[in-house]
Amino acid sequence: MPPTLLLLLLLLPPSLASPDRDIYALAKLKAALVPSPSATAPPPLADWDPAATSPAHCTFSGVTCDGRSRVVAINLTALPLHSGYLPPEIALLDSLANLTIAACCLPGHVPLELPTLPSLRHLNLSNNNLSGHFPVPDSGGGASPYFPSLELIDAYNNNLSGLLPPFSASHARLRYLHLGGNYFTGAIPDSYGDLAALEYLGLNGNTLSGHVPVSLSRLTRLREMYIGYYNQYDGGVPPEFGDLGALLRLDMSSCNLTGPVPPELGRLQRLDTLFLQWNRLSGEIPPQLGDLSSLASLDLSVNDLAGEIPPSLANLSNLKLLNLFRNHLRGSIPDFVAGFAQLEVLQLWDNNLTGNIPAGLGKNGRLKTLDLATNHLTGPIPADLCAGRRLEMLVLMENGLFGPIPDSLGDCKTLTRVRLAKNFLTGPVPAGLFNLPQANMVELTDNLLTGELPDVIGGDKIGMLLLGNNGIGGRIPPAIGNLPALQTLSLESNNFSGALPPEIGNLKNLSRLNVSGNALTGAIPDELIRCASLAAVDLSRNGFSGEIPESITSLKILCTLNVSRNRLTGELPPEMSNMTSLTTLDVSYNSLSGPVPMQGQFLVFNESSFVGNPGLCGGPVADACPPSMAGGGGGAGSQLRLRWDSKKMLVALVAAFAAVAVAFLGARKGCSAWRSAARRRSGAWKMTAFQKLEFSAEDVVECVKEDNIIGKGGAGIVYHGVTRGAELAIKRLVGRGGGEHDRGFSAEVTTLGRIRHRNIVRLLGFVSNRETNLLLYEYMPNGSLGEMLHGGKGGHLGWEARARVAAEAACGLCYLHHDCAPRIIHRDVKSNNILLDSAFEAHVADFGLAKFLGGATSECMSAIAGSYGYIAPEYAYTLRVDEKSDVYSFGVVLLELITGRRPVGGFGDGVDIVHWVRKVTAELPDNSDTAAVLAVADRRLTPEPVALMVNLYKVAMACVEEASTARPTMREVVHMLSNPNSAQPNSGDLLVTF
C-alpha cells in the first residue's frame, strides 16, 4: 500500500462512515481542480458542496451512486480546467468502478494511489496533459493489488513517459488498453501477451523500441491492434500474428518495420483493415493477402516493395481503399481493380507502373479519389471515371497519357481537384472543367492541348487555374472574371491573342497572374488596380503597348512585376519608387524612355532590370541622363552615376545610424521610465499562473530592468529573471496594451498556458496591468539555436546534435499542429525561436504569439506572418498562414542547420537561403542528393555521416516546396527525420494527395 494512502486512512476518524468518506474525497477532488476563468457561469462543479451530507453528494454533477449512497462513477468529460491535479484522496473512493476525467487538459501526474482502487473497472484519462511516469506496482511487503478489477484503461493523448505499465496475466478482465499518444519508451512488455481477455490494444504514437513481441500473437480475442506511429521497432511484423484469428484491424504504420510482409497475415480471415504504410518493408506483396476476404482497407504505401501487383488481390471484393503509392512496383495496373464494386480510394502514384489505366475504372460508381501520378502510364484517360458522380480528386500528372480529356470529366460536379499536368493530352479542354462547382484546382500544364477557352466560365471555388505550356489560342474571354475565388491564373506559353480583358479586375482574390509568352496586345489594363491581392504579375514576352499604367503603383503588396519584352513606351511612373513591397522588377527590352528614379525601391534594382530600353538613362543604367532631363542638377554622366551610388550609401548609413541611436536611447530611457511607472502602480499588477509559483507579480516586475535584457525581437523584449530561487524568462510584449482588461488576450494566453510538451517552452503564467503584458516562461540556459549555430560555438554543434535538435523541434511543432485542441499555428518559426536547455535539448518558443502583436513590427518581423527569410512564398500573394507555412519556415531552419548560414544575407540581392541552395545544387554535374548536400554543407564540420546529412537535406527540401500543398505535414516531418529511408527528395506536388 502506498505510504500516502496509508497515512490518509490513519488520519481519518474511525467514525467516518463510507459515504462521508466519499464526500471527503469529492471535496478534495473539487479543491484540486481549478476551473478555467473563461468558463461559463455557474462554474464547473459549483454544485459540489463540501458541506453536503449523504446522500446529497449523489446528486453532484457527474457523480453516480449505488443503493448504499457510495460513489460508483465519476464522469467529468470536457470539464474546462485552468489547472489542477488528481489528488491522492481519490483512492478513498473504494467503491468507485468508473472514473472518467477526459478532454479536460488536466495537468499533473497520475497519483500513485490510483491503482489501489479495488473496484475500479473503467479508467478514462484521455486527452489531458498528464505527465510523468505511470504508477507501477508497489514492490514492498503487503503491497495492494495493482488495478485488481480493471477492464478498461484509456490514457490516450497525454504526456506520460517512462516504461509502459506492467499489466500481466493477473489482469484477466482487461479488455481495452489504450496508452497511445504519449511518450512511453522501452519495449512492449512480453507480459501483454498474457492479457487473455484483451480485445483492444493501442500503443501508437509513443517512442517505443525493441522488437514487437511475438507473445502478442497469443491474444486470441484481440480485435483491434494499433502499435505504430512514432514508435521505432527493430525487425519486422511477427509472422505469428497470422494466429490472431479474431483480429479486425491491424495498424503498424510508421514504426520503422523492416523485412517482408509476412504471408501468414493471409490467414486473418476477419481482417477489415491492414495498415503497414510508412515503413521500410521490402520484397514483393505476398499473394496470400488475396485470402483476406473481409479486407476493406489495404495500405502498404511508402515502403520498398517491388514486383507486380499480385493477381490474387482480385479476390478482395470488399476493398474500399487500396494505397500502394511510393514503392517500386512495376507492371500494369490489373484490370480486376476496375471490378472492385466498393472501391472508393485508389492511390498508386510514384511507382514504375506501365500500360493503360483499366478502361472500366470508375464504372462501379463509388470512386472518390484516384491518384496514379508519376508512373509510366500510357493510353487514354478512361471515360467512366466519374460514372457514379462521386469522384472528388483526380491526379494523373507526370505520365505519358495521350488523347483528349474526356468530356465526361466536365460533367463531374463533385470534382474538387483535377491534376493532369505533364502528359501528352491533345484537343480542346472540355468547357465543363471551367464551371465545376466544387473544384478548387484545375491543373493542365505541360500538355499539347489546343482550342480556345469557352465564353462561359463560372467555377465559384476555383482557386488555381493552371493551363501553361500548351497550344491554347484565341482571346482570353471576359468570362475569366467570373472566378471569384481565383488566386493563381497561369496561362503562360500558349497562343492567346488580343487584349487582356478588363474583367480581370473582377478577380479580387487574384494573387498571381502569369500570361507571359503569348501574343497579347493592347494596353496593360488599368483594371488591374482592382486586384488588390496581386503579389506577382508576369506579362512578359507579349505585344503589350502604351505606357506602364500609373495605377499599378497602387498595388500595395505587389512583390514581382515582369513586363519585359513587350512594346511599352513612355517613362517609368515615378510613383513606383514608393512601392515598398516590390522586390523584383523587369522592364527590359521595351521602348521606355526618360530617367530611372533614383530613390525608394529603385535603389535595390540593378541594370538587368532596365536593359534593352535605349531611351532610359540614369540610376543603374549605363547611360547618363542629359542635364535638362536630370532636373538641371546634372553634369557629366560619371558625376550623376557617382551621385546615385553615393545616395545609396548615404541612405544606408543614415538608416543604420538612426536605428542604432534610437534603439540605444529608447532602450535606456524607455526601460527606466517604464520601471518607474511600474513601481508607482505596483498594486495594479495581476499575475495569472498556470502552475504553482513561489513568487509574486511584484517580484517579476523587479526583474524587468535593462541589465537583465537577454534578447529583443518582433514579439518583444526578453529579460532573465531570478527571484525567490526561481529562474525564468520574462517577455514584455511590445505594441499591445490592455493587460488584465483584455479578456480575449487572457483567454488566448490561458489556452497557450495549458500546453505541456517536452519540446515546447513552458508558459508558466503572465503578469499584466492596463498597459503591459509580461509572459513568464521557463528559462533556457543555452540560449537559442540561432545564437548557437551562427555564433562562435556553431562549429561545436556536430551533425548528430543538429539532427537531434531538428527532430526535437519537429516534435514540438507537430504537437502544436496535430495534438492541440484547437490546433495552434506558430506563425514565426525560426532558429531564434528554438531554445536549448541545459542538456541542449530543443524547445519551441513563442508559439501562437504573432496574433497578439497587433501592429507592432520590427526590422526583422513582418506585420503578420513571421520573420524575413522564413516566410512561406504563398503568404506574399494570399496573406494567409496555415500549418504548411510553419512547415516552410521549419525547412529554412533545417537549411540553416545544414549550411551553417543565416536565412538571408551573403547570397546576393534578393536571394535567400532557399533560392541559394536551389541554385548551387542545380548547377552541379551530379544531381544526386549526396552531391547536393556536400556542396552546401557547413564547412566547419567534417562531412560525415553522409547518410544523416542527406536525410536532413531531403526533409528540408520537401519542407520548402513552393506549393504549400506539396509540403509534408509536421507529423510526416517527424517520421522522415526518424526514418531516413522515408524522406523522399523532390516529391513535389505528389504530397498534395495526402
Swiss-Prot record:
ATP binds at I710, G711, K712, G713, G714, A715, G716, I717, V718, K731. Changing P903L: In fon1-1; enlargment of the floral meristem and increased number of floral organs. It is a single-pass membrane protein. LRR repeats lie at residues 73-93, 94-117, 118-141, 147-171, 172-194, 195-219, 244-268, 269-292, 293-316, 318-340, 341-364, 365-388, 390-412, 413-436, 438-459, 460-483, 484-507, 509-531, 533-555, 556-579, 581-604. GO terms for biological process: cell differentiation; regulation of floral meristem growth; specification of floral organ number. GO terms for molecular function: ATP binding; protein serine kinase activity; protein serine/threonine kinase activity; receptor serine/threonine kinase binding. Residues 704-978 form the Protein kinase domain. Disruption phenotype: Semi-dwarf with altered numbers of floral organs and rachis branches. Reduced number of tillers. Its EC number is 2.7.11.1. This is Leucine-rich repeat receptor-like kinase protein FLORAL ORGAN NUMBER1. It comes from Oryza sativa subsp. japonica (Rice). The gene is FON1.
